[in-house]
């Protein structure tokens, strides 16, 4: 029995431990699943935002590359013209230009050349012999008018949802509805407190009353429940002895019963008869009586 009790205790401990670990595991899953879901949602939102910013940056770089391809650089002729004017002198009094030549025949329109690369900075001009010339100030470049607006760009990615706005003002009260039908009567109310006792009335005047005629007898009432048992009566006189019955049949043989208890000691026996002198006494203590017997 002790071994079985120990086994039952061990199995009970193992069962309780398994149930406890299962409950802890279920609670852990219930707690960690929402956290993991929120983290995955946050990472997904961050990646989407970073991808949108990267896409916007890529589109901006591509637009800049397109603008650089379409830009026209100034040719080398204008730069050389400015350099030649600087080399010839800074003022008209020192360096006078020659007379204009005859106009040449109009040439054929040339093919549009490719935009050349920007040239190197020109060599500074030589100073005049007397050194009294002031440097010629280069006229500023005329501002070019703004070009036509470019084609509309691609729509950007949808932005993050904005914050919730402030709650609006409460609306106006509606028109009161029509009067409803009469409802069923309500339950009875709580009984009120008992009123104050009234004033003592006046005693009635006693008048002699004459007895009326006897009425007819009423119907018999229903049978009542049985009454409680009465008290025990006195002990009766013993009855007469009955006649002896017939003898019964012999019983079946059975095993002997256990020996009964020892009976009470019997009455004392009669006094013994007077003794007789023996004829011979043996050495071994044997006694022989007159009748030849040994007692």
From Swiss-Prot:
Sequence similarity? Belongs to the cuticular collagen family.
GO molecular function terms listed in the Swiss-Prot or TrEMBL record: structural constituent of cuticle
Question: What keywords sit in the KW lines?
Answer: Collagen, Cuticle, Repeat
Q: Does the keyword Repeat apply?
A: yes
Repeat: present as a keyword of the record? yes
Q: Which organism is it from?
A: Haemonchus contortus (Barber pole worm)
According to its UniProt entry, the function of this protein is described as:
Nematode cuticles are composed largely of collagen-like proteins. The cuticle functions both as an exoskeleton and as a barrier to protect the worm from its environment.
Q: What name is this protein filed under?
A: Cuticle collagen 3A3
Query: InterPro entries attached here?
Result: Col_cuticle_N, Collagen
Q: Where is the composition biased (Pro residues)?
A: 97-109, 146-160, 217-228, 261-271
């Amino acid at each position: 029995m002790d071994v079985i009790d120990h086994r039952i205790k061990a199995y009970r401990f193992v069962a309780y431990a398994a149930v406890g670990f299962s409950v802890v595991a279920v609670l852990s899953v219930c707690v960690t699943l929402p956290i993991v879901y929120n983290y995955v949602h946050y990472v997904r939102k961050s990646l989407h935002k970073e991808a949108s910013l990267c896409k916007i940056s890529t589109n901006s770089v591509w637009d800049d590359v397109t603008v650089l391809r379409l830009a026209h650089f100034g040719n080398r002729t204008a730069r050389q013209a400015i350099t030649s004017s600087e080399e010839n002198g800074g003022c008209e009094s020192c360096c006078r230009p020659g007379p204009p030549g005859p106009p040449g025949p109009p040439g054929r329109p040339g093919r549009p050349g490719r935009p050349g690369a920007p040239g190197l900075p020109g060599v500074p001009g030589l100073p005049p012999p007397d050194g009294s010339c002031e440097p010629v100030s280069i006229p500023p470049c005329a501002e070019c008018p703004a070009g036509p607006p470019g084609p509309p760009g691609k729509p950007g990615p949808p932005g993050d949802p904005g914050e919730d706005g402030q709650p609006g003002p409460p609306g106006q009260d509606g028109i009161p509805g029509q009067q409803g039908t009469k409802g069923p009567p309500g339950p009875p109310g709580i009984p009120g407190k008992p009123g104050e006792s009234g004033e003592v009335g006046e005693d009635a005047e006693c008048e002699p009353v004459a007895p009326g005629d006897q009425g007819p007898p009423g119907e018999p009432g229903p049978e009542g429940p049985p009454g409680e048992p009465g008290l025990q009566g006195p002990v009766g006189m013993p009855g007469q002895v009955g006649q002896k019955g017939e003898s019964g049949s012999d019983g079946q043989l059975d095993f002997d019963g256990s020996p009964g208890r020892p009976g009470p000691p019997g009455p004392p026996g009669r006094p013994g008869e007077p003794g007789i002198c023996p004829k011979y006494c043996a050495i071994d203590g044997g006694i022989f009586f007159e009748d030849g017997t040994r007692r």
